[in-house]
């Protein structure tokens, strides 16, 4: 097991052997210091010591307390579709993490044309603009400034703040917190001893808690009196890049596939493909938000010897599109959020709009 894999098992509460206990003890002091700093930061915003900026449109924030994947991107896409179905012009504000323009404030898509590549803007805003036709996306480390740019040039009716739970500088009218249904708080400790970006008490800032990756049954009782609902994820198909139609994953059964993913928990993606009955002869995990340069492409070419196709996530697909001529046929999967009890979410949206 890699060091990263061991740490993730420790931080999620899955690893509790002697080595895990020793490492946990070593990390306890920096975790306590980190927790104190982020608690004081949140307190400064709550008490008005740090300035909170307001945009002249409703802002819906989607975020989490833990590092790693809780399904933020599928949730943002789901919300965007629901809002657009209500006739709203929707703009997503994203940081642009991993793109060459990270730190700049730029429009990624005006709802008609995607003007920046994934290499420039990062994978998530480009993937969202690609998968939700008509969605406007902007990037900026300062989300307030990015929102002002969108107001000036795009005139949206509502904003979705992607990964915004800790971006306290921007006021939000609806604060949605996503939590993994199976391990909502990991081992309950802050970084680097656990998965938490903030202490558990930060749950109180949420207006709605959505438990993700639920398969049925009751959700954990982490949310207290805060309204909550459950949601699951489903791979609903795959599209041949660059612009093929989405087809059922069953169409790939009987062929030999190589899977790759540069996401927080790639093994979950690989397992989902196998559950769909796909013959995955090699599964290659890359770093989260991998850039897919020469090294990654060479790795894929070597692994694909004797295979029929490559298959990856939607976020990875927007980056692999630049290398299609050098690879086997590449399929990008479609991952959808499916609320199991959507009434609390719809009620929360009604209050904002």
From Swiss-Prot:
Cellular-component GO terms for this entry: plasma membrane
Broad enzyme group: transferase
Pfam family, one: LpxK
Pathway membership: Glycolipid biosynthesis; lipid IV(A) biosynthesis; lipid IV(A) from (3R)-3-hydroxytetradecanoyl-[acyl-carrier-protein] and UDP-N-acetyl-alpha-D-glucosamine: step 6/6
EC number assigned by the record: 2.7.1.130
Listed GO biological process terms: lipid A biosynthetic process; lipopolysaccharide core region biosynthetic process
UniProt cross-references to InterPro entries, sorted A to Z: LpxK, P-loop_NTPase
Gene Ontology molecular-function annotations: ATP binding; tetraacyldisaccharide 4'-kinase activity
Catalyzed reaction equations: a lipid A disaccharide + ATP = a lipid IVA + ADP + H(+)
Keywords per UniProt: ATP-binding, Kinase, Lipid A biosynthesis, Lipid biosynthesis, Lipid metabolism, Nucleotide-binding, Transferase
Signal sequence, renumbered to the chain: none
Family: Belongs to the LpxK family.
Protein purpose: Transfers the gamma-phosphate of ATP to the 4'-position of a tetraacyldisaccharide 1-phosphate intermediate (termed DS-1-P) to form tetraacyldisaccharide 1,4'-bis-phosphate (lipid IVA).
PANTHER family referenced in this protein's UniProt entry, alphabetically: TETRAACYLDISACCHARIDE 4'-KINASE, TETRAACYLDISACCHARIDE 4'-KINASE, MITOCHONDRIAL-RELATED
Name assigned to this protein: Tetraacyldisaccharide 4'-kinase
